[in-house]
């Protein structure tokens, strides 16, 4: 095939609606991070999306250079589409065929790539378009793919399902996708009223256990009993569905039934024995029980506390051993070892935590915890000061930064009261004074920028907008 023909083929491939053209990976996201997010971290595993998952896995396999495995996943996707959508096989297969074409193109098997392009064209030409058509099924498939693969495209996900619903407003699958996207939009980027859409999805498809748990999570603040009924109903309907078990565990944790939450996650762990995030959350729930005992100073619970502490450490260590990508597992482990008075192990996990690529907020928290460890347990004030200073140098306003600033000021004032010429105390105070000046200056610059860019709202928009 000539170079000109190859370029023509690539031009046609770019017109396809499939995982190779949807830009599902964030720009700074590694393939390991993408795969981990989709197949481990994200709890959503809708039964009706088996073909979607095979297509995503095929995309990942291709990116890893495992094209033979990618083709096998695409074969599975075709089989699931045949089973789950026998009346819409051609339309539903357009995405899978597009993925086939891309994989064969990258393998250099251009004739096979063209053959799958021809299959797509034959379907699309029925709708007067060569390689791309507007179809609710395709909008739905794109919506599911983006729902699984992205975290910052919730508005776009919602638009996909809304477009599908415009053409088929009574479709239960489209309504479920729309409701789930509304639920996610309730957290980021803006507040939505997800309750009504979740209720609508359940009315249209009563056997939607995952959606029922999402509704329960929305109701738990004010209607806990109704939420609990929905969760237990979902668990009866789908006792072996990991997304139901994991989301139900979140519900019980939020309603302060940590034992039930741990029980549900333990069931999920039997089905997902290599999922670091399930280990991680079980460990976090045990950790929460330990901290609750400590905060109440329940000395009668000392024996129970010791067992809970061991469990928390065990599960968080398993999470760290299974997947080192979880950012704050080392910080939690170090803190737990401090509580267990195992200081060598605590220091090991503090050091390991600093080697991870942490967000500014998590790094500040780690500096605070390590500083406290040096100050209170190791009785090494100089090392504690070093950690607090490193933490407050990070340019992000957080609660840990405020705590470290206060600790530094307290240490400096105490040292200066004992020796007015203490060089370290004077250095700390000078540093904090300079830091305060920088913060005030940055705040003024930010305020001036906001004044100059402040939009002028029309009365109708202002009056009808969401008040938050």
Swiss-Prot record:
Predominant location: cytoplasm
Cell membrane keyword on record: no
Cellular component terms (Gene Ontology): cytoplasm; cytosol; endoplasmic reticulum
Molecular-function GO term, any one: RNA binding
Induction section of the entry: By interferons.
Modified-residue entries (N-acetylserine), positions: 2
Per-repeat ranges for TPR: 51-89, 90-135, 136-171, 172-208, 242-275, 276-328, 329-359, 360-398, 399-441
Location of region: Disordered: 441-468
InterPro entries: TPR-like_helical_dom_sf, TPR_rpt
Subcellular location: Cytoplasm; Endoplasmic reticulum
GO BP terms, alphabetized: apoptotic process; defense response to virus; innate immune response; positive regulation of apoptotic process; response to virus
Compositional bias ranges of the Basic and acidic residues kind: 445-454
Record's keyword terms, sorted: Acetylation, Antiviral defense, Apoptosis, Cytoplasm, Endoplasmic reticulum, Immunity, Innate immunity, Repeat, RNA-binding, TPR repeat
One Pfam family per UniProt: TPR_12
Record note on quaternary structure: Domain-swapped homodimer. Component of an interferon-dependent multiprotein complex, at least composed of IFIT1, IFIT2 and IFIT3. Interacts with IFIT1 and IFIT3. Interacts with STING1/MITA and disrupts its interaction with MAVS or TBK1. Interacts with EIF3E and EIF3C.
Family stated for the protein in its record: Belongs to the IFIT family.
Functional description taken from the UniProt entry: IFN-induced antiviral protein which inhibits expression of viral messenger RNAs lacking 2'-O-methylation of the 5' cap. The ribose 2'-O-methylation would provide a molecular signature to distinguish between self and non-self mRNAs by the host during viral infection. Viruses evolved several ways to evade this restriction system such as encoding their own 2'-O-methylase for their mRNAs or by stealing host cap containing the 2'-O-methylation (cap snatching mechanism). Binds AU-rich viral RNAs, with or without 5' triphosphorylation, RNA-binding is required for antiviral activity.
Domain notes: The C-terminal part folds into a super-helical structure and has an extensively positively-charged nucleotide-binding channel on its inner surface.
The name this protein goes by in its record: Interferon-induced protein with tetratricopeptide repeats 2
Species assigned in the record: Cricetulus griseus
Taxonomy of the source species: Eukaryota, Metazoa, Chordata, Craniata, Vertebrata
Underlying gene: IFIT2
């Amino acid at each position: 095939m000539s170079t000109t023909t190859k370029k023509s083929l690539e031009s046609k491939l770019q017109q396809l609606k499939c995982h190779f053209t949807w830009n599902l990976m964030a720009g700074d996201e590694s393939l390991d991070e993408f795969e981990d997010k989709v197949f481990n971290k994200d709890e959503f595993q809708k039964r009706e999306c088996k073909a979607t998952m095979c297509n995503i896995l095929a995309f990942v396999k291709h990116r890893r250079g495992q094209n033979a495995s990618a083709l096998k996943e695409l074969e599975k996707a075709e089989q699931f589409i045949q089973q789950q959508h026998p009346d819409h096989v051609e339309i539903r297969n357009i995405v899978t065929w597009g993925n086939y074409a891309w994989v064969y193109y990258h393998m250099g098997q251009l004739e096979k790539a063209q053959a799958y392009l021809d299959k797509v064209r034959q379907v699309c030409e029925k709708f007067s378009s060569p390689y791309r058509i507007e179809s609710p099924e395709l909008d739905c498939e794109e919506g599911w793919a983006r729902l699984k693969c992205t975290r910052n495209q919730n508005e776009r996900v919602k638009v996909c399902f809304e477009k599908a619903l415009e053409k088929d407003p009574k479709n239960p699958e489209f309504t479920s996708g729309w409701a789930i996207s509304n639920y996610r939009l309730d957290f980021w980027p803006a507040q939505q009223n997800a309750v009504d859409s979740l209720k609508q999805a359940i009315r249209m498809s009563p056997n939607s256990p995952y959606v029922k748990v999402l509704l329960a999570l929305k109701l738990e603040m004010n209607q806990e009993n109704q939420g609990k009924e929905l969760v237990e109903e979902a668990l009866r309907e789908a006792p072996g569905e990991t997304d139901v078990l994991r989301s139900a565990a979140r519900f019980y944790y939020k309603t302060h039934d940590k034992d039930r939450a741990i029980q549900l996650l333990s069931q999920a762990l039997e089905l997902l024995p290599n999922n670091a995030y399930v280990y991680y959350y079980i460990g976090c729930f045990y950790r929460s029980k330990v901290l609750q005992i400590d905060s109440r100073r329940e000395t009668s619970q000392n024996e129970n506390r010791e067992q809970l502490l061991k469990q928390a450490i065990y599960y968080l260590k398993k999470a760290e051993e299974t997947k080192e990508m979880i950012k704050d597992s080392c910080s939690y482990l170090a803190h737990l070892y401090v509580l267990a008075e195992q200081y060598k192990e605590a220091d090991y996990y503090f050091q390991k935590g600093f080697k991870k690529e942490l967000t500014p907020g998590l790094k500040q928290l780690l500096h605070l915890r390590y500083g406290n460890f040096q100050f209170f347990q190791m009785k090494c004030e100089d090392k504690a000061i070093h950690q607090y200073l490193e933490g407050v140098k990070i340019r992000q306003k957080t609660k840990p930064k405020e705590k470290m600033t206060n600790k530094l000021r307290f240490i400096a004032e105490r040292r200066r009261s004992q020796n007015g010429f203490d060089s370290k105390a004077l250095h700390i105070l000078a540093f904090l004074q300079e830091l305060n000046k920088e913060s005030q200056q940055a705040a003024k610059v930010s305020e001036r920028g906001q004044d100059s860019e402040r939009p002028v709202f029309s009365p109708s928009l202002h009056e009808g907008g969401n008040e938050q």
